[in-house]
Amino acid sequence: MIKYFNRKTKQYEIEQVAGEKYLKWTYCSPIGMKLLELIIKKKIFSKLYGYFCNSRYSKKNIYPFIKNFNINMDDYIEQTDNFKCFNDFFSRALKNNSRSIDRDEKVLISPGDGRLQVYENIDLNKIVQIKGFTYSLYNLINDIEIAKRFYKGTCLILRLCPTDYHRFHFIDYGICDFTHKIKGNYYSVNPIALRNISNIFCRNKREWSIFHSKNFGDILYVEVGATCVGSIVQTYFPGKHVSKGDEKGYFKFGGSTIILFFEQNKIRIHKDLLEQSNMGYETKVLMGESIGIKYQ
């Protein structure tokens, strides 16, 4: 059971997990763990499933998925009948007016829809994956000089489950450098997996870039793939100026995670988010929603 805090209702809710029985069997049973290490975490498994999700045969899975998880398709540009395959549906784009982006330059917004956890004054060698598991920023990006810049800074972890909108966005005006790609495995990033496998973010396929923002300093963006994520697609142009809320990229099928690192004394996270994170709960947020302010 995964419990998260709904910021709008001020209530705790139970997450409806896609493939929950499969996840529990895979990550909590001896046979499942053996199969995970032999096949499921491998690129070939996710690649084959990606081929299926890109095929016309996968289209029949779209409507039941929408119905089972009560997805509001009024938020999106394309409607159900227009998708050619499941990956078209999974990487669906929002209508311009379906998310309210706070344009105040002092306001820090969420880069996407998902479940958010935040950590301040981070120890670069003990960043929290989930209670009881930590990892090193150097091992995450394989660049010690870049990692040092975020000592005592702030870390935001936005987990996107398969039912979420899977495009991610820039949180400010600025310029983003080119993307570094790191090969890796394809473990799930669901809390069921995070509680049973150490260093998942450092083991999985991932990409990172430095975003030179106008109001919040240099920000390290890290996109982490997961089981059945066919690819991480970057849609921005390195070196080109972007606006707050512009799309940076998207994930193809699977749950996935966006991690943002801020330098020390650049942002202040809203109190409610810190409180929930300190208690071990994720908070549901939407792209463009205010999650903090500029440090002053």
Swiss-Prot record:
<comment type="subunit">
    <text>Heterodimer of a large membrane-associated beta subunit and a small pyruvoyl-containing alpha subunit.</text>
</comment>
<dbReference type="GO" id="GO:0006646">
    <property type="term" value="P:phosphatidylethanolamine biosynthetic process"/>
</dbReference>
<feature type="modified residue" description="Pyruvic acid (Ser); by autocatalysis">
    <location>
        <position position="256"/>
    </location>
</feature>
<comment type="similarity">
    <text>Belongs to the phosphatidylserine decarboxylase family. PSD-B subfamily. Prokaryotic type II sub-subfamily.</text>
</comment>
<dbReference type="InterPro" id="IPR033179">
    <property type="entry name" value="PSD_type2_pro"/>
</dbReference>
<feature type="active site" description="Schiff-base intermediate with substrate; via pyruvic acid; for decarboxylase activity">
    <location>
        <position position="256"/>
    </location>
</feature>
<dbReference type="GO" id="GO:0004609">
    <property type="term" value="F:phosphatidylserine decarboxylase activity"/>
</dbReference>
<keyword id="KW-0865">Zymogen</keyword>
<keyword id="KW-0456">Lyase</keyword>
<feature type="site" description="Cleavage (non-hydrolytic); by autocatalysis">
    <location>
        <begin position="255"/>
        <end position="256"/>
    </location>
</feature>
<feature type="active site" description="Charge relay system; for autoendoproteolytic cleavage activity">
    <location>
        <position position="169"/>
    </location>
</feature>
<dbReference type="InterPro" id="IPR033177">
    <property type="entry name" value="PSD-B"/>
</dbReference>
<keyword id="KW-0472">Membrane</keyword>
<comment type="pathway">
    <text>Phospholipid metabolism; phosphatidylethanolamine biosynthesis; phosphatidylethanolamine from CDP-diacylglycerol: step 2/2.</text>
</comment>
<keyword id="KW-0444">Lipid biosynthesis</keyword>
<keyword id="KW-1003">Cell membrane</keyword>
<dbReference type="Pfam" id="PF02666">
    <property type="entry name" value="PS_Dcarbxylase"/>
</dbReference>
<feature type="active site" description="Charge relay system; for autoendoproteolytic cleavage activity">
    <location>
        <position position="256"/>
    </location>
</feature>
<protein>
    <recommendedName>
        <fullName>Phosphatidylserine decarboxylase proenzyme</fullName>
        <ecNumber>4.1.1.65</ecNumber>
    </recommendedName>
</protein>
<keyword id="KW-0443">Lipid metabolism</keyword>
<keyword id="KW-0210">Decarboxylase</keyword>
<keyword id="KW-0594">Phospholipid biosynthesis</keyword>
<keyword id="KW-1208">Phospholipid metabolism</keyword>
<dbReference type="InterPro" id="IPR003817">
    <property type="entry name" value="PS_Dcarbxylase"/>
</dbReference>
<feature type="active site" description="Charge relay system; for autoendoproteolytic cleavage activity">
    <location>
        <position position="113"/>
    </location>
</feature>
<comment type="function">
    <text>Catalyzes the formation of phosphatidylethanolamine (PtdEtn) from phosphatidylserine (PtdSer).</text>
</comment>
<keyword id="KW-0670">Pyruvate</keyword>
<dbReference type="GO" id="GO:0005886">
    <property type="term" value="C:plasma membrane"/>
</dbReference>
